[in-house]
Amino acid sequence: MNAEIIAVGTELLLGQIANTNAQFLSEKLASIGINVYYHTVVGDNNKRLQQAIEVAEERADMLIFTGGLGPTKDDLTKETIASSLEEKLVYDENALALISNYFKRTGREFTENNKKQALVLNGGTVFANDHGMAPGMGLNKNGKVYILLPGPPKEMKPMYVSYVEPFLRNFTTGENIYSRVLRFFGIGESQLEVKVQDLIDGQTNPTIAPLANDGEVTLRLTAKHQNVHEAEKLIQHVEDLILERVGEFFYGYDQEFLHYKAIELLKKKGLTLACAESLTGGLFGNQVTENAGVSSVFKGGVICYHNDVKQHVLHVPEEVLSTDGAVSKECARYLAENVRELLKADIGISFTGVAGPDASEHKEPGTVFVGLAIKDEPTVVFPLNLSGSRQQIRERSAKYGFYHLYKKLEEI
């Protein structure tokens, strides 16, 4: 079954709010085997909404609407759909009682426009709104399924989970969709694709979808099957083939981001970390502290943006700063080693470089050095040549820091 999501609201077209409902619904629908091929956004206008309905009916089996169920004049979703389907709107007694009781409790006047929220499509299934006023509804007519949901995510999401998904399962084959995301770093999207292109071209179940994002690449493996264990077998087989070829760049699954994986490995090894940040200006330390319980492994950091701090706090020799420069392999080495000693940590990591937009010390933007000093191990400095905006270079430098930290920890 194919679905189209139609988000109703002029505020969406104006960019005043993001259409997060479509993302949520697409993911949920995919998990129960309903394909979403189109997202449509239309303003609070009867004529344009009617046009959107007519177009969607030509290309989808299921039309899912969000928004436009409220009490105001521009909330016209159910009125437009009722007119299109030649169905009556009737009051749902449970919803009407809920709304009436709310106004009684709050001592406010129960006006006719608020009463409007209890109107539902005649003959449809009503979805209770446990977090708001306007109920949702579902109707199967003329070979199409129509689903109407409230716009506020705090109302729509729990309504979908509790009432809508069980209703939708009546229209599915029972074949569910299962996905697993493989995360890679240190290899470009085009390079990775070349290595697994035959697998991408030859697979239909599971499918393989690459995506590049901020210096890393993901592969989403998606399988369809009625049985979750069989779907996992399909995915595992393809995953094994992929990792045979590019396993050296693999670091995690799904939402296991680099900073999470690195910190979890630090905890597992029982090692502590300190950072010296010039180029990144605290970005690395900020991401470290996004992990719960990180105080057990993170000693702290020094933002050594000015050369005075590099020299007098982290004891980078003046001759290194004057000869090699602050953006150099030698400076990165001193920063990593000395912040480790200063904060009495097992590992010190440092970042120095040129974020741009202008060159510095006759070095081009994107010139970066990441130093890694591990107790009882030789210090390693990783030179990087990054591209992008000033912010992208800083963010990617921090990611490379987590990546090299993670890889070194795997070796210990």
Curated annotation (Swiss-Prot):
Query: Which InterPro entries does the entry link to?
Result: CinA (IPR050101), CinA-like_C (IPR036653), CinA_C (IPR008136), CinA_KH (IPR041424), Competence-induced_CinA (IPR008135), MoaB/Mog-like_dom_sf (IPR036425), MoaB/Mog_dom (IPR001453)
Q: Which cysteines are joined by disulfide bonds?
A: none
Q: Which SMART domains match?
A: MoCF_biosynth
- Signal sequence region: none
What Pfam families does its record include? CinA, CinA_KH, MoCF_biosynth
Which top-rank group of organisms is this from? Bacteria
HAMAP family membership:
CinA_B (MF_00226_B)
Family, per entry: Belongs to the CinA family.
* Protein name from the UniProt record: Putative competence-damage inducible protein
**Which gene holds the coding sequence for this protein?**
cinA
